[in-house]
């Protein structure tokens, strides 16, 4: 008798995606982050659902409802902190996943890569609107500052901002619609992730060497299911260490002060995972220029397949490109640090230099280095 998992219409889809999927035999732990992102998304949707049962999206009661969740709801505190720190784990996995794609040349799967970039934008949008919901000082002023950037768009900017606000300032209408967006976007992310997987399974996974692995494939289960379970256990370990021992480590103390439109916090800054982009935004003294640089810092990922001049796919056998890649990582860490610093000397100039270096490495140095490596190998 043929196995039901291979014949049943629904189970067949699951089987082809997670059980009998032919996978390269040599993929490393860097390939774990896809499944970890899936777990993060499921965790965020579940904890978010339980939070939404007790949250009220009204300017008068939003802050109190979050306090009520932490104090009065059974295990509300752990659900709230799992959701807040779960977002941080989500972004750590995202950055690792994108970094893996850049290092091993996975961006040559064009459809998979482009949907991945759209996913990155969608997750960033979700995290931004979510940060506004507790209605603390940083929530309010973060929403005001970031939405205000749209006013830099010529001609339609001001109308666009007022349309998003639902009035002439960030107020009740803004909070209500941000809650609606924050509820719907994760489901859009889940749908996009399925399309992402669909396109990936059309080509099969890349591997560290960047060489086609059709000649050496192994079934996904049990080899990579076991490997993924180990990754998931480690992810949950790190998440729970954060939640139970240092729940506010990555948050901002200003967000424990209720939103007050009459009092601006001394340093307005987003959550840590947006600091690199925020530093690039601040490093340009012109409003429209800053907004363009901010968007370009992520959109530049779409250009990666066009900027690939090497005759090898992966960086595994390209030491000069490897050095450049790690300089880029160091530069992004520098930008993250600068984004959290006040706008004064020497942070301004460091931020400007790091921003220039970021674009210079990706647009100029990486393609040139790849060409030099080709010539050294007499290709």
Swiss-Prot record:
Binding site for heme b b562: 83, 182
Pfam families with a match to the protein in the record: Cytochrom_B_C (PF00032), Cytochrome_B (PF00033)
Cofactors: heme b
Membrane topology summary: Multi-pass membrane protein
PROSITE patterns: CYTB_CTER (PS51003), CYTB_NTER (PS51002)
More details: Heme 1 (or BL or b562) is low-potential and absorbs at about 562 nm, and heme 2 (or BH or b566) is high-potential and absorbs at about 566 nm.
Annotated protein name in UniProt: Cytochrome b
């Amino acid at each position: 008798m043929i196995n039901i998992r291979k014949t049943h219409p629904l189970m067949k889809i699951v089987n082809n995606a997670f059980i009998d999927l032919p996978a390269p035999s040599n993929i490393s732990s860097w390939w774990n982050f896809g499944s970890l992102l899936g777990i993060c998304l499921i965790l965020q949707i579940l904890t978010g659902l339980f939070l939404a049962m007790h949250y009220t999206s009204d300017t008068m009661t939003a802050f109190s409802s979050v306090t009520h969740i932490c104090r009065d709801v059974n295990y509300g505190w752990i659900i709230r902190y799992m959701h807040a720190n779960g977002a941080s784990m989500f972004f750590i996995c995202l950055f690792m996943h994108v970094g893996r794609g850049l290092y091993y040349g996975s961006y040559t799967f064009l459809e998979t890569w482009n949907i991945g970039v759209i996913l990155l934008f969608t997750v960033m949008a979700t995290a931004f609107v979510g940060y506004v919901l507790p209605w603390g000082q940083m929530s309010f002023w973060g929403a005001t500052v970031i939405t205000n950037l749209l006013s830099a768009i010529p001609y339609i900017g001001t109308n666009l901002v007022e349309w998003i606000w639902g009035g002439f300032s960030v107020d009740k209408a803004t909070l209500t619609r941000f809650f609606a967006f924050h509820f719907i976007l994760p489901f859009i992310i889940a749908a996009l992730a399925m399309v992402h997987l669909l396109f990936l399974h059309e080509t099969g996974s890349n591997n560290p060497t960047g060489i086609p692995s059709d000649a050496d494939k192994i079934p996904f289960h049990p080899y990579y299911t076991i490997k993924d379970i180990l990754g998931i256990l480690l992810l949950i370990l790190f998440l729970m260490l954060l939640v139970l021992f240092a729940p506010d480590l990555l948050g901002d103390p200003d967000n424990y002060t209720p939103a007050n439109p009459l009092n601006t916090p001394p340093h307005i800054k987003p959550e840590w995972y947006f600091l690199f982009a925020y530093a690039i935004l601040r490093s340009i003294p012109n409003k429209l220029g800053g907004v363009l640089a901010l968007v370009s810092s992520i959109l530049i990922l779409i250009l990666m397949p066009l900027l690939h001049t090497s005759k090898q796919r992966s960086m595994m056998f390209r030491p000069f490109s490897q050095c450049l890649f790690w300089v880029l990582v160091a530069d992004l860490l520098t930008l993250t640090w600068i984004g959290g610093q006040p706008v004064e000397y020497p942070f301004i100039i460091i931020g400007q230099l790091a921003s220039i270096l970021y674009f210079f490495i990706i647009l100029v140095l990486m393609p040139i280095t790849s060409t030099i490596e080709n010539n050294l190998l007499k290709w």
